[in-house]
């Protein structure tokens, strides 16, 4: 379990995190249960930072990056929390992601290999392991990514695909050479693979294994109420830094309070709402089944079709479940959430 929570109102902001982090090593993933994930981003101003997910970014611990940033920030401040986050991201990029060129190259080749494995599995499952259909499905999957019009991730809004393709060509060639049984001498397929990977990288909804959620929260120098900005960090490759905006929240004249949950939110939801999400869903299912059975029982125990039609139209299982949900949400809001605010 790894989770973050922020509670803000017009008076203050409170942030908290559990102590579990995931550390990625060349040999796999390791979970550490005694880590600190909440830090002051500035020694002089009310700005904090917390994270969840992978504890390392490009092999460097997030905690180390935060301490280095805080040291160089000194007593400087920014007008808004958004500017603090932008400066922090710029600090990471300007320091070459705190890793060598060799590490960046190796990480990119690992991402290309993961992409190949993803497409391979989808194609194999779709083709039902029939070799005659596999290559066709492999090409179809690559083409579907190329033609997908999904919005780009935050850092690739002005993405120049041809520049990225040029920078990864050599790395893609290494991965393609490892899988000669699939690519062979098929030059168009090789070009399609490279283009599809570039599109996959740019798409905002693409998933990568080593994700770190960063949350910056507090008061900008020109902000009288607290605000929160968060991004998901993935990787850096020379001038290409992949990250995506996640949750944004702020207190305003019209919005007097906010609760933000990140990471594995099921435990936090249980704590805040007073009921587990799965239990809530089970309650709706049980109530829906009960009303359906009751309706059928009543219909089966009347003689005339007119009476059956009246019962059938009077008892709407869907509306009853919706009414239960609305009632329960009101109770949760009044008894569990409102006291926090």
Specify the residue positions occupied by each region the protein language model found.
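N-terminal nucleophile
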Residues: 1-341
């Amino acid at each position: 379990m790894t989770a973050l929570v922020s509670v803000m109102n017009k008076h203050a902001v409170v942030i908290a995190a559990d102590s579990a982090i995931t550390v990625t090593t060349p040999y796999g993933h390791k979970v550490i249960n005694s880590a600190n994930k909440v830090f002051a981003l500035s020694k002089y101003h009310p700005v904090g930072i917390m994270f969840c997910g992978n504890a390392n970014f490009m092999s460097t611990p997030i905690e180390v990056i935060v301490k280095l940033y805080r040291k160089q920030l000194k007593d400087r401040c920014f007008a808004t929390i958004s500017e603090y986050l932008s400066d922090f991201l710029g600090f990471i990029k300007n320091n070459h992601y705190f890793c060598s060129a060799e590490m960046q190259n190796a990480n990119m080749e690992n991402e290309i290999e993961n992409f190949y494995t993803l497409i391979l599995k989808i194609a194999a499952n779709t083709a039902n392991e029939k070799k005659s259909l596999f290559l066709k499905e492999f090409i179809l999957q690559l083409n579907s990514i190329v033609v997908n019009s999904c919005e780009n991730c935050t850092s690739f809004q002005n993405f120049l695909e041809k520049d990225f393709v040029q920078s990864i060509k050599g790395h893609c060639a290494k991965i393609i050479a490892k899988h000669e049984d699939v690519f062979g001498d098929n030059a168009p397929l090789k070009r399609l693979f490279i283009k599809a990977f570039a599109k996959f990288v740019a798409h905002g909804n693409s998933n990568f294994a080593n994700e770190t959620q960063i949350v910056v929260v507090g008061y900008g120098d020109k902000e009288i109420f607290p605000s929160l900005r968060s991004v998901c960090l993935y990787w850096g490759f020379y001038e290409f830094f992949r990250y995506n905006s996640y949750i944004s929240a702020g207190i305003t004249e019209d919005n007097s309070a906010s609760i933000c949950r990140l990471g594995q939110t099921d435990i936090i939801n249980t704590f805040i709402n007073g009921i587990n999400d799965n239990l809530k869903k089970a309650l709706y299912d049980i109530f829906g089944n009960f009303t359906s059975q009751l309706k059928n029982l009543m219909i089966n125990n009347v003689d005339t079709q007119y009476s059956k039609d009246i019962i059938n139209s009077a008892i709407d299982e869907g509306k009853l479940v919706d009414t239960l949900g609305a009632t329960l949400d009101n109770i949760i809001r009044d008894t569990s959430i409102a006291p926090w605010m």
